[in-house]
Amino acid sequence: MPLPLFALAVAAFGIGTTEFVIMGLLPNVARDLGVSIPAAGMLVSGYALGVTIGAPILAIVTAKMPRKRALMGLIGLFIAGNLFCAIAPGYAVLMAARVVTAFCHGAFFGIGSVVASNLVAPNRRAQAIALMFTGLTLANVLGVPLGTALGQAFGWRATFWAVTGIGLAAAAALAVCLPKNLAMPDTSITREFSVLKHPQVLMVLGISVLASASLFSVFTYITPILEDVTGFSPRQVTYVLLLFGLGLTVGGTLGGKLADWRRMPSLIATLALIGIVLALFAGTMHLPFAALATIFVWGILAFAIVPPLQIMIVDRASDAPNLASTLNQGAFNLGNATGAWLGGMAIGSGVSLVSLPWVGVAMAVAALALTLWSASLERRPVAVPTEYV
């Protein structure tokens, strides 16, 4: 891995850890701060809201900054946010600190994707983005379990102190490894926002929302599925989630290679396979070994779509990629929240856990339909705004 990509991956590891580790610490946080579990759960929603709101704001604020300075500033915000999480005296301050921390998330991955794609040869750009996002998948495999164990042993604040340390290590890696002469975007606020007039950019954002909703409509409720339907113990569920995380890691690498080979066909095939695997999961969740195989393959497919979607947004907004790339991170998080809400609504309306994967299938089919429409438009000439000519 080239050193600049390694530095970006270290930062991605820290950001991914702080995003997801709170899920394993909710009982500890609720007990320590004297709030209910649902109230503590809002710390997850607050983070997602921070990503969605902060991504476009910071993309515009940093549009004229040198890329290295922008990334260093964003990781500095990440460090400060986690520091305030660690010392938060109460729930309100912790929520505010979570939102501030989330502000850097979308902008960092958005700008980082553009930087990563410019560090390598044109035929390896998707793989470069996948390498950066490897940090995010490793956060699920290693960062979240270790952070949860640390928080359970020494208190949830210890986890945020540790993540602050990861942020400092990431800042040092970025300072040393990122070149100073990174390409500066020749852009303006008007040009950045003009990408929203491009139908293909909007389609990619829509695909990202639907694909992410397909995952989280089921994965949000994976623990009760595995315990109540499959029959795994809570301890065994931890190992199943580790297996899913390994699948995510494999999927990110595979998705990068496929996107550099045949981007649109590989995306279409992956979305179709996601729908098929989720449909199969409705049956295999009753059988422990079959469920394990299905979950691992699902993990591979779930993250294999990220590199092609990220490089597509960069290409389709080639004159002003920073805002579009950053908005795509917001789209993924909007899909996370939408999927969790749809799954919860389905369960609340009487849909059983066994039937829940069909909600994910519906979202995957919708994402596939939008992708096929995008592909059909891509094959024929279309009128585009003058900014792209």
Region annotations inferred by a language model:
Residues 77-84, 92-101, 289-297:
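Paired small-residue
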Residues 108-120, 304-317:
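Intracellular juxtamembrane helix-capping segments at the cytosolic ends
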Residues 55-66, 251-263, 347-348:
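Helix-to-loop junctions at the C-terminal end of transmembrane segments
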Residues 97-135:
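Cytoplasmic helix-loop-helix junction between adjacent transmembrane helices
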Residues 53-92:
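Conserved MFS/SLC helix-loop-helix module at the cytosolic interface between two early adjacent transmembrane helices
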